Regions:
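Short amphipathic alpha-helical surface micro-motifs
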Residues: 5, 28-32, 67-69
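Short, compact, well-ordered microdomains
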Residues: 63-102
Length: 102
């Protein structure tokens, strides 16, 4: 069956430096039960497949990502109805969302 993914692209300025380090680490795991099936490093950011888990925000909490990052994921998935979040260093900042200078 064909699956359609809805996506939003936004700046990595919306995440903290600490969350960036966590995402980098999680996206580079090599073990079979790692997070690389739903957190992907792109070279200039990350792709998050939020439909890979029933409760992705709870999973992010268990993995140690900040409340600010989890709130961003909730906001993007609810406001824009997306299942794929592309955080990219070259993307635009979205209005009304916090940004971090790192």
């Amino acid at each position: 069956p064909l699956t359609t993914l809805t996506c939003i692209r936004c700046s990595t300025a919306h995440i903290t430096e600490t969350d960036n380090a966590w995402l980098y680490s999680l996206s580079h795991q090599t073990n079979d039960d790692g997070e690389t099936e739903w957190i992907h490093f792109t070279g200039s950011g990350y792709l998050l497949r939020t439909d890979a888990w029933s409760y992705p925000v709870l999973r992010l909490k268990r993995l140690g990502l900040s409340r600010t990052f989890r709130r961003l994921v909730v906001t993007l998935t609810r406001r824009y109805g997306v299942s794929l979040i592309h955080l990219d260093a070259g993307a635009e900042c979205l209005p009304g969302l916090p940004t971090f200078d790192w």
